[in-house]
Structure formats: C-alpha cells, structure tokens
Amino acid sequence: DMSHTDAMTASTSSESGEMMNSDATTIGSATLSLSISGLTNLGAAFAYEGWLIVDGQPISTGIFTVSDDGMASATEFVLSVDPVTASSFVLTVEPSPDPDPTPSAVHLLAGDLADGSAQLSVAHAAALGQDFAGASGAYILGIGYPAGLQTGNSYRNGIWMPSLNLPQLPSGWAYEGWVIGADGPITTGRFTAPGTQDSDGSGSAAGGPGTGPNFPGQDFLSQPIDLTSGYAAAITIEPEPDNSPAPFSALKPLADAMIEDVGDHGAQGFVNEAASFPSGRISISN
C-alpha cells in the first residue's frame, strides 16, 4: 500500500520538523493522492475540484471529471502549497469552465487532515454536515390538486410525500423528488424543507407552482401516468445551482424500487440508501 507508506513518510518528516527546514519539501513537490468511491459523471459543463484549507483559506488542489463507469480523470495532484499547514480537504462541484477561482457552495465531501491523510465523508461539517443514516419517510398515491381532475384520472396519477424525515441541507443543496419509469426519471419538484410545497406545486400536468398540499409531490393529470405500472420513487440531494436536469444519483438518501397499488392514500415506505453515498480518503506524500 504505497499511499499508506507515503503518508507515514510525510507524517514522520513533519513530526521531526524537517519539512519546515530549507532542505525539506519545497512547494510543488508534494503529491496529493485521491481515492473516492461513489462519484458520478457531472456532464460536460461541471467538474469536481479539490481544496486544501490553509489558515482558513481554500487552495485548489486541482480539477477532475468522472466517467460514466466511475473512473476519475486524475487521482494524483502536485500541490502548490506546503501541505503541513493544511487543516482539512474539501471536494466541491464547480462549473466547467469556471469563471470564479473560489469554491462553489456545493461542498460534497470533506475531511480533517492528520499525519498526511484524511478520511472524506458527506457528514463532515464542511460538506453536507449529515450522514443521512436517519433519513426516512413514506409516500402515498392520491390527487393533491382535485381541481385539475379530468375524465379517466385516478389516485394512481398522483404521488405525495407527507411524512419525510430529512435533515436541513446547507446552502448549495436542495432535495428533489422523482418517479422513474421505462422512459427515465421525471421530477416531482425540488424542496428544501419536507413540510413545504415543492418548487412546482402539483406540477405542470396539474395546477402548477403554488397549488397542492404543503408537502412535496406531483399530480400527472393532463398527461396521465399510472404510477403503479412499473415506476420507482426516489428522493435525491441536488446541487444548487443544478449541474443537470437528471437525478444527482450519487446522493439518493431515499428510494423505493417499485410503487405498488396499496389504494388511495395508502402509505408506502422509502428505503434508506445513504450507505451508497460517496466516501474516500486523500493522502499526501513527498
């Protein structure tokens, strides 16, 4: 395990104070190695960027992308700063190309540095600040905007989420509900707090923004969708601003693989999938 050996070397030299001397690490000679699982392709207009926090200030460690099969375009980065002075590492989602040299508000992973390495998680206070292991909830089938009912509509054309137990998100993130069928995912709206209307209310196929009950959901009335005909339901955590109209599948705290017909307003539970969230580590070597 080279990374472990390198991390040990870095920690040994820093403990003896050699890195502060003139014959020690010169800026630009230390390498940061990144090993992260669970990252997804952000599309052509966005990229991942690493940051070392030095005296409270972010210093970029470099930009990389991730392919559809989860492979990073780069995993080793030559540092432009003395890593001994760094306290933590943060991974953000950035526009590409990026007109702003500072980090975006979309902090995905972070970790504190100790002995030249850091474990990275979404739960770190500099990332999302929660591990989402306690996220839970249920949804019902039913019509949230009865004024939009048309001939042939039924409770199977609406999905609503009245009982969601989700933590508050930091700036840079929003929740989004989805139904996923053979033709791909369809949004049910974005929201920041579970007990509020989502961004599109009862949806464009019903009454639109500002209509429906005070919790997230969607009616598919003017273009009816039978949600019991092979659809899944999910809630993702999305970058704000969003990198793509598709689900940010790396952060999907709640999902149900099959919406079943349990009757009008019958509750169906979500499964917690936070264990699949991205995680990893960095190590710094000379």
Please place each PLM-identified region on the residue numbering.
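N-terminal targeting/export leaders
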Residues: D1-N286
